[in-house]
């Protein structure tokens, strides 16, 4: 029914695309490869649904980001390893359906150079339950960059209003596992009666020069 959230990077002398699919029940995420950025070959589903499980992410997940070698605007994105592992960011909803219920964020890792065999956390690393009212409706896309040995995770979230708004916040970590929200969140806010009055979302952060 839908293909969403493409994230393109260079790995093993090929272009890879991390992307999410929706089948009416929930999100699952996959990889495709290409030599020319125009013709893509499906490689495999890496984040699957597991309804027989009692895991927090059993409905499946929307993978949004993989940690890169660097975050330079002027370079092709290449995967980077942290402690010998590749890292993937995803969010998962608690119920079947389209974005059904408040999502939470997890980080998966792999040592597999083919990027097909992933280890998923037993619990989310970042939850709306620990946040403020502006994110009480759940979390969405996140991206992670490193600056001065500190990890920064930018994420968008929504409130619980019927006509909800989505805004972008940031959290920091020293180990990718334990995150602390910035007290000044949200760092990107909606502007009433403007083009961005409801959504300021889907962050993608790069560094340009100094």
Features from the language model and the residues they span:
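Carbohydrate-active catalytic/glycan-binding domains of CAZyme proteins
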Residues: 1-210
């Amino acid at each position: 029914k839908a293909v969403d959230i493409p994230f393109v990077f260079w790995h093993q002398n090929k272009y890879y695309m991390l992307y999410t699919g929706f089948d009416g029940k929930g999100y699952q995420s996959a990889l495709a490869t290409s030599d020319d950025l125009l013709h893509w070959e499906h490689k495999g589903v890496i984040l699957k649904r597991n309804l027989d499980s009692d895991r927090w992410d059993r409905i499946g997940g929307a993978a949004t980001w993989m940690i890169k070698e660097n975050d330079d605007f002027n370079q092709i994105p290449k995967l980077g390893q942290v402690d010998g592992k590749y890292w993937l960011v995803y969010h998962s909803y608690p119920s079947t359906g389209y974005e059904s219920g408040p999502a939470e964020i997890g980080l998966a890792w792999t040592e597999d150079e083919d990027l097909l065999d992933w280890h998923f956390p037993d619990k989310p690393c970042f939850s709306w339950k620990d946040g403020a009212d502006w994110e009480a409706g759940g979390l969405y896309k996140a991206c992670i960059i490193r600056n001065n040995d500190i990890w920064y995770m930018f994420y968008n979230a929504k409130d619980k209003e019927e006509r909800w708004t989505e805004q972008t916040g940031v959290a920091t970590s020293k180990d990718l596992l334990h995150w602390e929200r910035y007290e000044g969140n949200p760092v990107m806010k909606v502007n009433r009666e403007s083009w961005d009055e409801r959504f300021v979302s889907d962050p993608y952060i790069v560094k340009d020069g100094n």
